[in-house]
């Protein structure tokens, strides 16, 4: 989650989290900043149709949220924010700011206090699930959209009609073992052929999104992998 960003001269790079992102292998990479980082630009193809009938939309209560654990400088700001950065914040809590994709934003608007999310490391040497966090504050206005010095400043957003929102998250725990993207992809491909909970997982079907919903079956299956040997 992003707390605040660190201004820097030029150093390692990491992540700009705009909800657009790079493809990690077959997937994605959203960036974000944590107080120091967050997500940035929106990908047109990911923008949700605002006219969709809400009544037809499925309801989710579990999530996967991506952030960059390795340093990356964007406009003089290090957008790095990994799970260790979240753990280091007061009360191990921070705001997930910088999301600049409509669909990802809309998913955050659906989040409720107490719901769980996987902290996913993206745009790094080994992307994958690092730990668990929970939502501790529901969607509210993301102040970084109005800050001209912020990497995620959006001049088209107005104070009386803000476009972007964020939630607060709190670290819960690390997974017993890091669950890499490569392993998840193997299960996804297998489940597409033979059937299984990860056959339609958004990590692969909507890879560009930095904030993704999970079904109960997907969440429980992925979490169970921490007790299994890597494949």
Swiss-Prot record:
UniProt biased composition (Basic and acidic residues): 14-24, 45-54
Instruction: Assign the protein's first listed, main location to one coarse class.
Output: nucleus
Q: Which InterPro entries match?
A: 5hmC_binding (IPR052181), EVE_domain (IPR002740), PUA-like_sf (IPR015947), THYN1-like_EVE (IPR047197)
Please tell me which stretches of this chain the record labels as motif Nuclear localization signal.
4-11
Subcellular location field = Nucleus
What is an example of a Pfam family matching this protein?
Answer: EVE
Q: Which PANTHER family match?
A: THYMOCYTE NUCLEAR PROTEIN 1
Report the protein's function.
Specifically binds 5-hydroxymethylcytosine (5hmC), suggesting that it acts as a specific reader of 5hmC.
In its UniProt entry, what is this protein called? Thymocyte nuclear protein 1
Q: Which organism is it from?
A: Danio rerio
Q: Which gene encodes it?
A: thyn1
């Amino acid at each position: 989650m992003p707390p605040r960003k660190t201004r820097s001269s030029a150093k390692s790079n990491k992540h700009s989290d705009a909800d657009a992102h790079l493809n990690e292998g077959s997937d994605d990479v959203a960036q974000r900043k944590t107080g120091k980082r967050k997500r940035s630009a929106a990908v047109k193809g990911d923008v949700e149709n605002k006219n969709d009938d809400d009544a037809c939309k499925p309801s989710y209560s579990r999530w996967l949220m991506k952030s960059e654990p390795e340093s990356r400088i964007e406009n003089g700001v290090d957008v790095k924010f990994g799970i260790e950065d979240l753990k280091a914040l007061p009360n191990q809590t921070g705001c997930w700011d910088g999301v600049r994709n409509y669909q990802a934003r809309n998913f955050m608007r659906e989040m409720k206090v107490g719901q769980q999310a996987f902290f996913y490391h993206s745009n790094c040497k080994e992307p994958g699930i690092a730990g668990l966090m929970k939502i501790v504050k529901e969607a509210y206005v993301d102040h970084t959209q109005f800050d001209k010095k912020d990497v995620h400043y959006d001049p088209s957003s107005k104070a009386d009609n803000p476009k972007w929102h964020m939630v607060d998250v709190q670290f819960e725990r690390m997974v017993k073992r890091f669950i890499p993207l490569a392993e998840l992809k193997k299960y996804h491909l297998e489940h597409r052929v033979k059937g299984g909970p990860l056959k339609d997982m958004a990590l692969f079907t909507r890879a560009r999104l930095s904030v993704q919903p999970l079904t109960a079956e997907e969440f429980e299956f992925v979490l169970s992998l921490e007790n299994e040997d890597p494949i």
